[in-house]
Curated annotation (Swiss-Prot):
GO biological process, one term: mismatch repair
Source organism: Prochlorococcus marinus (strain MIT 9303)
UniProt-recorded name of the protein: Ribonuclease HII
EC number: 3.1.26.4
A matching Pfam family: RNase_HII
Reactions that this protein is recorded to catalyse: Endonucleolytic cleavage to 5'-phosphomonoester
Localization per Swiss-Prot or TrEMBL: Cytoplasm
MF-aspect GO terms: manganese ion binding; RNA binding; RNA-DNA hybrid ribonuclease activity
Length: 200
């Protein structure tokens, strides 16, 4: 028997390629009715949404979802485990925080979630095909970007409020001028500093 929508979670990550800060994951359970309503409101992959549209969707998702949760893995965990394992850890943490028993997890992408012991299915481009995955993407993106922007005043000079940790030219120049912070992913910066100087 196929699992009901109320027991299916969509999970997605954001910030995988960033140089700074944690990788985030969202996990969302939606009824079929909630999925249709959110899609009608413009729900899609968070990367395709403007900041304003994404912010408008967040409370709609939180209200419509049967359950939702977030997880993260720190820059230190990324350096210790590698980005794939750390990303999976953030997804597992999000899924474990859901109060709803799950019969199936839909994972965005082509790689299965190795740490998840229950049934799962990968969905290529799931954040543009599956409402629950798209909703997870939006919640995770909004939460991560909000955190990084709040940290911008603490780590002044890196332009975090503009690039939220991604590897832009502004970020690269700041790293070369100021060096990495405690929240930078050192494993991501090896090539940059191999060319331009030591990683201190």
């Amino acid at each position: 028997m196929d699992p009901s929508a109320e027991s299916i979670a969509g999970v997605d990550e954001v910030g995988r390629g960033c140089w700074f800060g944690p990788v985030f994951a969202g996990a969302v359970v939606l009824t079929e009715v909630a999925a249709v309503e959110l899609l009608a409101e413009g729900l899609t992959d968070s990367k395709a949404l403007t900041v304003r549209r994404r912010a408008r969707l967040v409370p709609l998702i939180e209200d419509a979802a049967t359950a939702w949760a977030l997880g993260q893995a720190s820059a230190r965990e990324i350096d210790a485990l590698g980005i794939r394992s750390a990303t999976e850890l953030s997804m597992l943490r999000a899924l474990q925080r859901l109060p709803t028993p799950l019969e199936l997890v839909l994972v965005d992408g082509v790689l299965p979630l190795r740490l998840w012991m229950g049934p799962q299915r990968t969905v290529v481009r799931g954040d543009s095909k599956c409402a629950a995955i798209a909703a997870a993407s939006v919640l995770a993106k909004q939460a991560r970007d909000g955190l990084i922007k709040r940290l911008a005043s603490r780590f002044y000079g890196y332009g975090l409020e503009r690039h939220v940790g991604y590897g832009t030219a502004i970020h690269r120049r700041a790293l070369l001028d100021l060096g990495p912070t405690a929240l930078h992913r050192r494993s991501f910066l090896t090539k940059l500093f191999a060319v331009h100087g030591s990683l201190t």
